[in-house]
Amino acid sequence: MNQKKISLFGFFALTASMVLTVYEYPTFATSKLHLVFFLLLGGLLWFLPVALCAAEMATVEGWKNGGIFSWVSQTLGERFGFAAIFFQWFQITVGFVTMIYFILGALSYVLNFQALNTDPLIKFIGLLIIFWGLTFSQLGGTQRTAKLVKAGFVVGIVIPSIILFGLAAAYFIGGNPIEIPINKHAFVPDFSQVSTLVVFVSFILAYMGVEASASHINELENPKRNYPLAMILLVILAISLDAIGGFSVAAVIPQKDLSLSAGVIQTFQTLILHFNHHLGWLVKVIALMIAFGVMGEVSSWVVGPSRGMFAAAQRGLLPKFLRKTNTHEVPVPLVMIQGIIVTLWGAVLTFGGGGNNLSFLVAISLTVVIYLVGYLLFFIGYFVLIYKKQNLKRTYNVPGKRVGKTIIAGIGFLLSIFALFISFVPPASIAKNETHTYQMILLISFVVTAILPFIVYELHDKRGHDTIEEPRHFKARDVNPAIYPAARGEHHIIKKEEHILKH
């Protein structure tokens, strides 16, 4: 019996959660009106190439069940396939830090306790309490917290975003002063000033993860027409909402006063008190809502990305103990290792960066460069597919035959290289005496991370460790649309009696 196909709107709804990245608005705001240019650049020349190339790879006969691990393994070999899935997982160990910084910024306002956002030691302790609390809450199974994640998305992300957009619109319509220049020269960045371009990496981060939804193209009605249309609609929505959100922050908060972890709360405070000085309590309510929403997002990331590493363990590429799950189908050893790594990153970034904007910027840049290495492998794998494996059957093709495919993938590949290198240039928004710290933390962390999966792959004896269970890919019906696509993971965790942890 043929499975019911999903409609254009249904497919769009599966991916739409990625367009609301409220905790990135302050970083977008540091680019002032350049944010529109960067959103267009990233959306049209990076997001769309990734989405289209991923869709073609997802429909290749025999590749439909494996995601990026399978795509890269089939084109570049198992070693690089493991590296790709490793980078896709490892980036979130840094990403947790930026999300929790944002939560701490909101809570510091609610509790009127600024040290929670500025004192490195207190900030680190707060990070540990939130992260480990949310991690342990997930050990009972993700089904228990699915409703919490949905509620967090609506209450803590969607509603505050609507309120922010409404307040900002009223502020602008009222003819109130705007903190950034608005003229025809303000839209396009000065390419001779490299330090002003580095913020582009945060815009790339906003678009990352779409390949996780590309796999569902096999369930989509008329994919040749509907998939590109869904992605174009998604880009338009992302550009519109992120431009409004970033501009709202930039317009009301002076650049010198902008906190990257608490900038959204600063914006709510400025706008609400502008209209009514007696509504300070409302700012705290909204800050609490946002903290709740981002906590829900953090909890959704705890298990999802580790599913890819669990699939690698099932294929015998990691030690046997990493195949273990508890009775709730949570890969506890992997999640605990993830937690230890997050703790180490939290210490490095919080104490190394002083717990201020520098820590936040390094964390964002490091997240992006780790993820980008995985995307470079993805694009190289795609080139191998279209030039050396062109005879493989597939149900979707990137438009333009081989020439069009090369141009589209080439643009995405080159922009990935540009974003990777530009990440190591200190941003214009940090003080000159902090530039060396920024570069050293980022460079050392990146080099260690880049070689780590290859060391792990070589050191583990893979002989005799046969695949114990072929990974089973999520269907659209299994997906919680309130969860960011990359946070869902792509595979079911198959519980085997002999691999259940004993109490």
UniProtKB/Swiss-Prot annotation:
Subcellular location: Cell membrane
Keywords, ordered alphabetically: Amino-acid transport, Antiport, Cell membrane, Membrane, Transmembrane, Transmembrane helix, Transport
Signal peptide: none
Topology in the lipid bilayer: Multi-pass membrane protein
InterPro entries referenced in this protein's UniProt entry, alphabetically: AA/rel_permease1, APC_superfamily, Glu_antiport
Main location: membrane
UniProt keyword annotation of Transport present: yes
Any single GO BP term: amino acid transport
Name of the protein in its database record: Glutamate/gamma-aminobutyrate antiporter
Functional description taken from the UniProt entry: Involved in glutaminase-dependent acid resistance. Exchanges extracellular glutamate (Glu) for intracellular gamma-aminobutyric acid (GABA) under acidic conditions.
Species classification: Bacteria, Bacillati, Bacillota, Bacilli, Lactobacillales
Cell division keyword on record: no
UniProt catalytic activity: 4-aminobutanoate(in) + L-glutamate(out) = 4-aminobutanoate(out) + L-glutamate(in)
Natural source organism: Lactococcus lactis subsp. lactis (strain IL1403) (Streptococcus lactis)
